[in-house]
Swiss-Prot record:
HAMAP family: Ribosomal_uS3_B. PANTHER family: 30S/40S RIBOSOMAL PROTEIN S3, SMALL RIBOSOMAL SUBUNIT PROTEIN US3C. GO terms for molecular function: mRNA binding; rRNA binding; structural constituent of ribosome. This is Small ribosomal subunit protein uS3. GO terms for biological process: translation. Binds the lower part of the 30S subunit head. Binds mRNA in the 70S ribosome, positioning it for translation. InterPro entries: KH_dom (IPR004087), KH_dom-like_a/b (IPR015946), KH_dom_type_2 (IPR004044), KH_sf_prok-type (IPR009019), Ribosomal_S3_C_sf (IPR036419), Ribosomal_uS3_bac-typ (IPR005704), Ribosomal_uS3_C (IPR001351), Ribosomal_uS3_CS (IPR018280). Keywords: Ribonucleoprotein, Ribosomal protein, RNA-binding, rRNA-binding. It comes from the Bacteria. Residues 232-241 have a biased composition (Low complexity). It comes from Mesoplasma florum (strain ATCC 33453 / NBRC 100688 / NCTC 11704 / L1) (Acholeplasma florum).
Length: 241
């Protein structure tokens, strides 16, 4: 029986790199891994309005480098680097080492409409604000195709529109070859809180095939086709909103 797997994990070492880059002995591995999880949670909490896409961590015994990909670099830096100092202090507190040297590097996401993490978060935030889950998915797909992606797939799950029974609805446009390992697939999951429960938002974006170590991303507008919607078996129950 087939099983689903994260497209990001499936492509590690092939077309994607690890988000943590360090080496540790057995007794130190668990400690550093736990710290990395807490560091990401803490930094995302501090930069909740900065549209952070990914946080890569590189570290040694005495140094740690955070590489933050964001669509709003000015918010990450803050006035006179104030936010950077706050991040460094938070990391030292989590690591319980005041002498730990913390370096923060900021990389700007020039096209947030083609970033799966930012697209999923935007869809989730709109659903939290009571926007139509169908409308926001179509709008996100339209923006992504205009940004030049090869294909995009979206999916929302939960009590859509506040109905009694949970279901899944989504759209797909263009080519999204999840089984092609050389395809540069960007995947993200976001949980949107609503008054009637959590709504899960998933986004898959295809940036093209990786050839010679470089992704063949297009810059021109992709062709617009008719929307193709997929529903699960429970879609006919609970009514349409």
């Amino acid at each position: 029986m087939g099983q689903k797997v994260s497209p990001n994990v499936l492509r590690l070492g092939i077309v994607r790199d690890w988000e943590d880059t360090w080496y540790a002995e057995k007794d130190q591995y668990v400690k550093w891994l736990d710290q990395d999880i807490k560091i990401r949670e803490g930094v995302l909490k501090l930069l909740k309005d900065a549209a952070v896409s990914k946080i890569k961590i590189e570290r040694t015994n005495s140094n740690i480098t955070l590489i933050i990909r964001t669509a709003r670099p000015a918010i990450v830096l803050g006035q006179e680097g104030k936010n950077v100092s706050n991040i460094a202090t938070a990391v030292q507190k989590i690591a319980k080492d005041r002498n730990l040297k913390v370096e923060v590097k900021v990389i700007e996401v020039k096209n947030p409409d083609a970033d799966a993490t930012l697209v999923a978060r935007w869809i989730g935030e709109q659903i939290t604000n009571r926007a139509s889950f169908r409308t926001v998915q179509k709008l996100a797909i339209r923006k992504a195709l205009k940004a030049g992606v090869k294909g995009i797939k979206t999916s929302v799950s939960g009590r859509l529109g506040g109905v009694e029974m949970a279901r899944t609805e989504g759209y797909i446009e263009g080519s999204v070859p999840l089984s092609t390992l050389r395809a540069d697939i960007d995947y993200a999951l976001y949980e949107a809180p609503t008054t009637y429960g959590q709504i899960g938002v998933k986004v898959w974006i295809n940036h093209g095939e990786v050839i010679g170590g470089q992704s063949q991303r297009v810059s021109e507008k992709a062709p617009m086709n008719n929307d193709r919607r997929f529903n699960n078996k429970n879609n006919n129950r609970g009514g349409r909103k």
